[in-house]
């Protein structure tokens, strides 16, 4: 009888490790949400390096098992969200922030905490449970919610607030990279006016005005959005629907907008944007993910994940070729892709 070969080579061990990692990939997502929900980065930020027992006293929980919380923090250290150092006097272990967890502190300019709470919301997981159905043309968000993402957001104050906080957080976070890209390539040279379509709270518009004082900037969004935002005296605010009309300007800005839509709707939006431009010299400025960009390859996984996420929402993240085809169908004469220090790129389309 042949003796079973129980030897496992390095490749098989690596394969096992890969499958185990993906099998429990959900754990990192849930732990990320949990640490933000508990405010652990905020606690350490406000109090400096803290011991486990000190950290427990600040948690928003009625009671906490020290042993279980130790296991909890051990996993977060493994995720490189926190580090452990030993106090030279007391010899106690203390937890400190890492560059990653510094991005999870609420209220900072560079905080992704609100975006984490949006992307890890239980309703997001509910939609992802229908991912296979997207392959035969179904719309997972509809299947999960019996409505579109936009109707759900408008009709649910809690979700609406989470979404708006996340969008404001993300815009604030990537604004320096956007402004730097616009400056480096002189994108706003000769531009006296710009409309930020879907500009929400006006974070990006305010950043543009501060960096380019010669530009008059307007924020356009749906009526219920414009009604609730705190107005900035440096900006004009316009309630409207981008599928109907866009105010005239030298440049139209669409940040993280077109990825919400399939090609036909994008072409409609782009055509309306083009109608708002002057007969010569106008430009549409897109801030969107370019899936196959060679810029910042560390973001490749995130870009591909966003591509899947937007597909579930009946949207689409696009490659260089797909952006080129889309802009050509919308009759733009040329375009330029500008890599920036962010997950997105700037795409300037010339009319």
UniProtKB/Swiss-Prot annotation:
<dbReference type="InterPro" id="IPR016461">
    <property type="entry name" value="COMT-like"/>
</dbReference>
<keyword id="KW-0489">Methyltransferase</keyword>
<feature type="active site" description="Proton acceptor">
    <location>
        <position position="259"/>
    </location>
</feature>
<dbReference type="InterPro" id="IPR036388">
    <property type="entry name" value="WH-like_DNA-bd_sf"/>
</dbReference>
<dbReference type="Pfam" id="PF08100">
    <property type="entry name" value="Dimerisation"/>
</dbReference>
<dbReference type="GO" id="GO:0032259">
    <property type="term" value="P:methylation"/>
</dbReference>
<feature type="binding site">
    <location>
        <position position="242"/>
    </location>
    <ligand>
        <name>S-adenosyl-L-methionine</name>
    </ligand>
</feature>
<protein>
    <recommendedName>
        <fullName>Columbamine O-methyltransferase</fullName>
        <ecNumber>2.1.1.118</ecNumber>
        <ecNumber>2.1.1.89</ecNumber>
    </recommendedName>
</protein>
<keyword id="KW-0949">S-adenosyl-L-methionine</keyword>
<comment type="subunit">
    <text>Homodimer.</text>
</comment>
<dbReference type="InterPro" id="IPR012967">
    <property type="entry name" value="Plant_O-MeTrfase_dimerisation"/>
</dbReference>
<keyword id="KW-0017">Alkaloid metabolism</keyword>
<feature type="binding site">
    <location>
        <position position="198"/>
    </location>
    <ligand>
        <name>S-adenosyl-L-methionine</name>
    </ligand>
</feature>
<dbReference type="GO" id="GO:0046983">
    <property type="term" value="F:protein dimerization activity"/>
</dbReference>
<dbReference type="InterPro" id="IPR029063">
    <property type="entry name" value="SAM-dependent_MTases_sf"/>
</dbReference>
<comment type="function">
    <text>Catalyzes the conversion of tetrahydrocolumbamine to (S)-tetrahydropalmatine and of columbamine to palmatine, an isoquinoline alkaloid.</text>
</comment>
<comment type="pathway">
    <text>Alkaloid biosynthesis; palmatine biosynthesis; palmatine from columbamine: step 1/1.</text>
</comment>
<dbReference type="Pfam" id="PF00891">
    <property type="entry name" value="Methyltransf_2"/>
</dbReference>
<keyword id="KW-0808">Transferase</keyword>
<feature type="binding site">
    <location>
        <position position="221"/>
    </location>
    <ligand>
        <name>S-adenosyl-L-methionine</name>
    </ligand>
</feature>
<dbReference type="GO" id="GO:0009820">
    <property type="term" value="P:alkaloid metabolic process"/>
</dbReference>
<dbReference type="InterPro" id="IPR036390">
    <property type="entry name" value="WH_DNA-bd_sf"/>
</dbReference>
<comment type="similarity">
    <text>Belongs to the class I-like SAM-binding methyltransferase superfamily. Cation-independent O-methyltransferase family. COMT subfamily.</text>
</comment>
<dbReference type="InterPro" id="IPR001077">
    <property type="entry name" value="O_MeTrfase_dom"/>
</dbReference>
<feature type="binding site">
    <location>
        <position position="255"/>
    </location>
    <ligand>
        <name>S-adenosyl-L-methionine</name>
    </ligand>
</feature>
<dbReference type="GO" id="GO:0030778">
    <property type="term" value="F:columbamine O-methyltransferase activity"/>
</dbReference>
<dbReference type="GO" id="GO:0030762">
    <property type="term" value="F:tetrahydrocolumbamine 2-O-methyltransferase activity"/>
</dbReference>
<feature type="binding site">
    <location>
        <position position="241"/>
    </location>
    <ligand>
        <name>S-adenosyl-L-methionine</name>
    </ligand>
</feature>
<dbReference type="GO" id="GO:0008171">
    <property type="term" value="F:O-methyltransferase activity"/>
</dbReference>
